[in-house]
């Protein structure tokens, strides 16, 4: 899990990276570290609360470093790539099955993401398996991803969250292709 604070400097063509952090918790490591019984809803919610606290503690130093920049800037824009945010967006869109074209570029209200996270955190693995767009392979791990997202939203409240399915590498590649400044250079006729 990586977080990057980009500057909004009007004179720059490409946003400047002001600070970044690589958090020691991804969904797998957080899920495996924060173990416990999950027989009841209360036990599942307790585990979720502990996961959020662990992530928040890991982000505290970064939050402190970026606070001075955040104090005088416009409202925060968050962008999540792949994994949990795309799963939550697909649930928000009420898709019958995952559809990358519908999810990529979606803008989801942050309160909706939080509500879905809260709902999933109280469900059993079997209940989550039955939801479209989660399935067997993510049913156990998705709650850890929800805890990471909720901890981020606790520290940096935003009205909405942009969702990208294509990932950061594709964005970097498109940026490099478009480095000469020609708007169509990233792929003539493609959705930008």
Label the predicted regions.
Residues 1-2:
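Acidic, divalent-metal-coordinating active-site segment for phosphoryl/phosphodiester hydrolysis
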Residues 5-192:
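Helical "lid/coupling" subdomains associated with nucleotide-phosphate turnover
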């Amino acid at each position: 899990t990586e977080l990057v604070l980009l500057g909004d400097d009007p004179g720059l063509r490409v946003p400047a990276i002001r600070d970044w952090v690589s958090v020691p918790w991804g969904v797998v490591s957080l899920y495996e570290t924060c173990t416990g019984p999950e027989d009841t809803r209360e036990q599942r919610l307790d585990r979720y609360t502990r996961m959020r606290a662990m992530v928040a503690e890991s982000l505290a130093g970064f939050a402190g470093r970026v606070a001075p920049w955040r104090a005088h800037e416009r409202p925060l824009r968050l962008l999540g790539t792949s994994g949990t945010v795309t799963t939550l967006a697909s649930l928000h869109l009420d898709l019958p099955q995952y559809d990358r074209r519908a999810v990529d570029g979606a803008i989801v209200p942050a309160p909706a993401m939080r509500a879905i996270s809260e709902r999933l955190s109280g469900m059993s693995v079997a209940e989550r398996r039955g939801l479209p767009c989660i399935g067997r392979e993510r049913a156990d791990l998705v709650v850890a991803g929800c805890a990471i997202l909720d901890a981020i939203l606790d520290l940096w409240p935003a009205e909405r969250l942009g969702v990208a399915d294509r990932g950061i590498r594709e964005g970097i590649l498109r940026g490099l292709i478009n480095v000469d400044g020609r708007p169509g250079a990233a792929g003539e006729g493609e959705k930008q």
